[in-house]
């Protein structure tokens, strides 16, 4: 971009859900609690205030995905960080306080309970069946072709057998990839097309 112009910006969240000062617990008689420690960033994916992701070119979506991967990998270099969540808010109904199109990345020092349970169940499945549960589900869905919405060389998009919410779609890599930070540029280019 030309001087002063930008297409994607990343900055610390002005009102972070977590902080990075490694605060200790705060005790209150019977209860013990801990402050949410971590990193909270905003990824603004367009300079245009009225644009939304469906207005973006595939190339621009790929650049957004690569920016998120870059921030993910940078956050995971911190030995205190155990879990990174990436999400996109769209409008006030989703809790967005910033109307401009953006994503949020929250990196925390503990694995959230729900994610820990998912990881434990995946590990149990792998011990019993010799493969990752996500890979097994993706293979099953690709074989049955009942819930497949879209498919590319490296990805499959499908509705879960038991959705937790309306319009839920899972997008999974066809081959086992440990985490988002391991996706290649080519894979993210392909994912952007979906």
Q: Which stretches of residues belong to each language-model region?
A:
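HIT superfamily nucleotide-processing domains
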Residues: 1-194
């Amino acid at each position: 971009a030309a001087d002063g112009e930008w297409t994607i910006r990343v900055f610390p969240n002005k009102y972070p859900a977590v902080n990075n000062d490694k605060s200790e617990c705060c005790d209150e008689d019977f209860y013990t609690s801990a402050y949410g420690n971590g990193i909270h960033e905003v990824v603004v994916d367009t300079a245009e205030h009225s644009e939304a992701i469906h207005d973006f070119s595939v190339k621009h979506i790929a650049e957004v995905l690569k920016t998120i991967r870059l921030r993910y990998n940078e956050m995971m270099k911190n030995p205190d960080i155990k879990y990174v969540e990436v999400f996109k808010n769209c409008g006030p109904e989703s809790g967005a306080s910033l109307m401009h199109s953006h994503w949020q990345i929250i990196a925390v020092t503990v694995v959230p309970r729900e994610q820990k349970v998912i990881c434990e169940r995946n590990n149990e499945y792998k011990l019993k069946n010799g493969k990752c549960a996500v890979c097994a589900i993706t293979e099953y869905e690709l074989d049955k072709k009942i819930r497949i919405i879209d498919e590319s060389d490296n990805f499959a998009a499908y509705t879960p057998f038991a959705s937790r919410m309306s319009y839920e779609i899972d997008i999974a890599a066809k081959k086992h990839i440990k985490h988002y930070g391991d996706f290649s540029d080519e894979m993210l280019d392909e994912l952007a097309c979906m």
